[in-house]
Amino acid sequence: MSDQRTIPAGKASFAARIARGSAITLAGFGLSNAIRLGSNLLLARLLFPDAFGIMALVSVLMVGLVMFSDIGITPSIQSSKRGDDPDFLNTAWTIQMIRSVILFALACALAWPMAWFYDQPDLLQLIPVSAISLLILAVQPTRIDTASRHMVLGRLTMIELASQFLSVALMLVLAWATGSVWAIVAGNVASAAIKVALAWLALPGITNRPRWESAAVSELVHYGKWIFLSTAASFLLTQSDKLILGRYLTMEGLGLYNIGFFLAGFPILMGHALIGRLMIPIYRENPPAHSPENFARLRRVRMALSGLMMALMVPVTLGGVWLVDLLYDARYASSGVVVVMLAVALLPQILTLSYDQAALASGDSRGYFWLNGTRAGLLVVLMLLAVPLVGVAGAALAIGLTHLLCWPLGARLAHRHGAWDPVHDALMGGL
């Protein structure tokens, strides 16, 4: 492909791009999670609950390595004035390759400590093979970030769905044939390979080549040093429950918790998907502090997102036990109570879910870090206090309290960038 293939700016209005991007993201998220739920249900019948527990630990390590080394390449490309400059993009791609190779080596080195700490010898083999996906993602093109920058999301969503569907099909065939947790590992590696191949073949944009431009490195590092710390904090926010519970629960118990978390967290995950794709471009092109019209536009988008998440969360909260009984066999019945507890605990997140994106769009990655760092530190402390006493219920309590207690900090950060909406918070908090 020629280097001259680029994504056109287009003449569609910004509102039309928001509407189209929202519709595509929602459709993609719905289909993706339908595939994920279907595969989860089928795998639950082909494998045993402890398989989901041990893969939760593998996933925690893979996610942790990626998040603890994230210097914010994607949000930097989305928000930078040089986000379409080939030298900037190629430098970002080169940094990504170096990082991925280092992550693979770290994953291999951490396999033995993980196996020893959780007393699971299988992790010695499962972790290094799973880490092959990190090497594959090293050559993922920046075309993905360019498509996201310009909210050209249709083809990007199709690539993600195709890679997920094909890898799940492979996973299910292998699980049926072997009854082994290795089926999940093979599917995850295949997913990375398919996504990278399709991105190179199907997305417009430059053909990335190794490049090291000092100015680009300086901008990426300056922006990314706080993103690095913020994503490390985000890892603790999203994965510390599994790390801590994995020490106190059996692998079967951890697997049941993981299934419950997936069902309870669906609306929040959908919100993150929409916000991650839409909010930085919205803040960048329509800064809410610049005019009442921009603020009103942002309020409409935020109200729609929060209302949608709330409408999905309430039925999950009320019907979690029934949902698990409907979808899973008797071995997984305990997940129903987990769904209810976690759905209640996750509700406070809706209040401030989009506020931190205002900081990123303004280049305030430091403020973004302090918010996430405070949340993470508080969550870990509450988890360590509550989980040994009451187990899974303690984890749910810690999650809920963390987001309630940190709401003033999120509101303060949003206010600094003209994005705080007390009307939104009062309405959603009242509900």
Which residues make up each language-model segment?
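Alpha-helical transmembrane segments of polytopic membrane transporters and translocases
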Residues: L42, D50-S69, S133, A193, ...
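Membrane-interface junctions at transmembrane-helix termini in multi-pass inner-membrane proteins
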Residues: S76-D85, I136-E160, W182, A343-T374, ...
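Transmembrane helical elements of multi-pass membrane transporters/channels
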Residues: G21-L37, S163, S167, I184-A199, ...
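Interfacial segments at transmembrane-helix termini and the short loops linking adjacent helices
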Residues: G10, F52, W112-S130, T317-L347
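Hydrophobic alpha-helical transmembrane segments
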Residues: L124-A131, M158-G205, Y223, F261, ...
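Interhelical loop/hinge segments that connect adjacent transmembrane helices in multipass membrane
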Residues: S2-F14, I18, G154, M158, ...
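Helix-loop junctions and terminal segments of transmembrane helices
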Residues: F68-D84, S148-R149, G260, A264-V301, ...
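C-terminal transmembrane helix end/exit motif
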Residues: S2-R5, T74, T142-R149, L153, ...
